[in-house]
Amino acid sequence: MNYKISIIVPFFYKEKIVGENIPDFDLLSFNKCLSAIFKSKYKNYEVILVSDNSSPSSIKLTKKYPYKLIKLKKNNGAANARNQGAKLASGQILVFLDSDVEIKDNSLTIINNYNNKKNNVGILQGVYSHKPNYNSMTQYVHSYQCYHVFFETKKKKYTETLCTCFVAIKKKYFFKVKGFNSNFSGAETEDLDLGYRLMEKNHKIQLEQRLKTIHHTNYGILYFIKKIVSRHTSEMKMYLRNKKDIFKRTQQLSHTPVLISIILIAIKILIIFGNFFYKIPNFNEILISLIFLFILTNIKFLKFLLNSKGFLVAVRSAFYMFFHFFLLMMCIVFGILDFYVFRNKY
C-alpha cells in the first residue's frame, strides 16, 4: 500500500529591523529543505507549510514549489503551527520536519515501507548526520546530538526521544493524544512532551538510522547559549510537572556521563567559590583531579569526536563540552526557580 504522507514544515521569519531581535531562520536552508523534499523518489505526498506570522519575503521564496500554505496571523510557537498543519493534512502519515533540515531522496520510501509492516510502533524517528562541517562549535553540537541522542541508542530498537527535526507519526496516533501541547510558546520541548504522551498510550518510537538528515544550522556562542538555556530550562520544568517520571524518562540528563559531568562541574564551582573564603588544602591538586575525572567520564565521546572530526575539533570540543554542561547545570537551577518561585509551569 502506498500511504499518503503529509509533510508539515513550520517556519517563522521576519525582515531584519534595527533594534528588533531576529528569529533563528535561514532562507537558504529553507530552500534546501524544500528542494530536498521535492526530489523524493516516493511521490504520494503533500507538503504543508505553516507560516507562523512570517514576513512575505520568506513566502515568495517558496513560489516555485507546489504546497499548501497556512498563514497564521499571530506567532504562537512551533507546537501550535504544527497542530494547524496536522489539521489540514489529508495523509495517513504525518511527517514533521524542521525548516533547516534536508532529507534524503529515499526517506519517504523508507517511511512508507515501514508502515506497511504489521507493528504497533507507528512512529519513526530520523537522525542527524555529521554534516555540514561549519565552525568547530557547530561540529561539536552536531556530534553531541549524534552521539548522546542517537549514536548511543544505535544498538537499541526503540528510543524515548522524539525530535521534530524529522519524525513520522501515524495521524490516528497523533490525534489520539491531541497533538502537540500548545502551552509551549517557543520551539522548546514540545516534541519530548508529545513523545512521552505517545509512549503512555503504548506507542513505541523506533529510531531509524537510515533516515539521516543534514541539519543546516551554524552555531555561534550566543546562539548556542540561547538554544541550550531555552530548551533545557523548559525540559527541567517538564520533568517537574511529571515528577513520577523525572528519573524514568529524561533525554540528556539520563545519560550517566552527562549527569556525572554536571555533578563534577558543580563540585568544582563550589570548591572555587569556597576557596575565596577559606583556603582549601591541596586546592590545585583537587581542581586538576576534577578536570581529569571530567575528561575520563567523557572519554568515549571524545574518542568518537577524534575518529569522526579529528584532533583539533576534539580538543576544542573538550572546552565546549565543559561550557555546555555548565549551562545544563544552570538550566536545572533556572528551571526549578522558574517553576517553584515564579510559578511558571511552562
What is each model feature region?
Residues 181-186, 190-247:
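Catalytic donor/gating beta->alpha subdomain of glycosyltransferases that bind UDP-sugars
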Residues 94:
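Short aromatic/hydrophobic "clamp" motif used to bind/position activated sugar donors
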Residues 36, 51-59, 98-102:
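A conserved acidic beta->alpha catalytic loop
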Residues 130, 151-169, 185-187, 193, ...:
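A recurrent flexible, glycine/aromatic-enriched loop bordering the glycosyltransferase active site
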